[in-house]
């Protein structure tokens, strides 16, 4: 609270491990903002995620008189007009939505706090458009459930304050992670069916949508038909991938969340998805073709309830498991795995090619966290002393280019 009020504008990045409760953190801040008679806007990358956030926040905040509304493309007609009126006159304290939050007709009464969930999923212009809905620069919280190394966080988000949550809610059991070879598939399917027989649910993740004769990766279409017609023909099996129409994707995901499906065969579209506490099994086919961070994100879809959860990593062939698979088998610490990923793949691959030039440091290495932290401290002192960056033309140009890549406002 002391960070927010009275007049200091908050710019904070919040990298969290999967399942660590980031929505609750945003909700607690939103409650403080509402108490100060300002509004909060929370923008999520998908309608499914926005709906989940709105439900969670409404349950958390409505007992305290904080009103929460959901604005997505599905809200139409009279319901939409009424919601927009309530938002403009201040009757809504917290609005959660997708890109609908930045449409021209959407007006806020007193927007004071902006939360961008999984900010790397939005373009710079989209993030700017939401911030510009406020009369004055609002507080900003950028959240991601993708753990990144501290050195990378300092480099990428040096202009923001950083809060890292690396603890899970109390009572969460560790997820049992195991590597399997294709020869062990029948035994694995029996293990999964045993879980389903107890009323639990399972994800099966494939790297491709359609079969590709040029490689041996499993496609979600072929795997769905195989599982639904053979080993799990007595179960309710659903199919999900990015080529499905948005309405169909949302309907399938909702069926799974409501317990109408026992198994969901999907691509990585579930990497950032709804919270299904009853899902206790994650099977990742061709696991050796995924990066560490993505494997950890997918594993985080289970282990959210009271029951023991399992993550099964199926190899593509009979070769020995790679180092990254061994690392994820033995550790559930997302930030440790991010450090390992940094060493194995390098910063450009982790954060994306668009950022690679900005991360090519001339002197330091991104594995040298103490040096980067010291450099950040010195840079802050340089600015506080009123030193003129323009005296150093080459550095000024580099900083300007870097800011265009990373700055949110």
What are these regions (language model features)?
Residues 1-9:
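Single conserved hydrophobic/aromatic residue that forms the stacking wall/gate
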Residues 11-326, 385, 390, 409:
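Inter-lobe coupling/hinge segments of SF2-like helicase ATPases
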Residues 306, 310, 318-409:
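C-terminal accessory region of SF2 helicases/translocases
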């Amino acid at each position: 609270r002391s960070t927010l009020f009275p007049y200091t504008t908050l710019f904070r990045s919040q990298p969290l491990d999967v399942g660590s409760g980031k929505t609750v953190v945003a909700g607690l801040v939103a409650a403080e903002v509402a108490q100060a008679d300002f509004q909060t806007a929370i923008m999520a990358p998908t309608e499914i995620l926005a709906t989940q956030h709105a439900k969670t926040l409404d349950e958390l905040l409505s007992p305290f008189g904080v009103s929460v509304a959901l604005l997505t493309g599905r809200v139409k007609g009279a319901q939409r007009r009424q919601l927009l009126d309530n938002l403009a006159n201040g009757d809504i304290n917290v609005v959660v939505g997708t890109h609908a939050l930045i449409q021209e007709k959407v007006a806020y009464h007193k927007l004071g706090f902006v939360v961008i969930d999984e900010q790397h999923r939005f373009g710079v212009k989209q993030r700017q458009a939401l911030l510009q809905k406020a009369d004055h620069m609002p507080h900003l919280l950028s959240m991601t459930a993708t753990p990144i190394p501290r050195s990378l966080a300092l480099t990428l988000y040096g202009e923001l304050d950083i809060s890292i949550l690396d603890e899970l809610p109390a009572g969460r059991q560790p997820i049992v992670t195991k590597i399997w070879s294709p020869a062990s598939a029948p035994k694995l399917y029996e293990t999964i069916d045993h879980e389903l027989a107890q009323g639990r649910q399972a994800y099966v993740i494939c790297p491709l949508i359609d079969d590709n004769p040029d490689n041996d990766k499993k496609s979600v279409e072929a795997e769905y038909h195989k599982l639904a017609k053979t080993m799990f023909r007595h179960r309710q099996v659903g199919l999900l991938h990015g080529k499905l129409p948005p309405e169909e994707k949302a309907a399938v995901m909702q069926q799974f969340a409501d317990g109408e499906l026992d198994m969901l065969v999907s691509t990585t579209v579930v990497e950032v998805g709804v919270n299904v506490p009853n899902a206790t099994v994650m099977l990742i086919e061709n696991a050796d073709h995924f990066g560490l961070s993505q494997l950890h994100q997918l594993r985080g879809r289970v282990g959210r309830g009271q029951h023991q959860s399992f993550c099964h990593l199926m190899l593509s062939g009979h070769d020995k498991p790679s180092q990254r698979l061994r690392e994820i088998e033995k550790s559930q610490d997302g930030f440790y795995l991010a450090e390992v990923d940094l060493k194995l793949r390098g910063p450009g691959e982790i954060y994306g090619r668009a950022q690679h030039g900005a991360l090519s440091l001339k002197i330091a290495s991104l594995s040298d966290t103490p040096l980067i932290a010291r450099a950040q401290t010195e840079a802050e002192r340089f600015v506080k002393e009123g030193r003129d960056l323009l005296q150093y033309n080459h550095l000024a140009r580099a900083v300007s280019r870097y800011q265009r890549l990373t700055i949110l406002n």
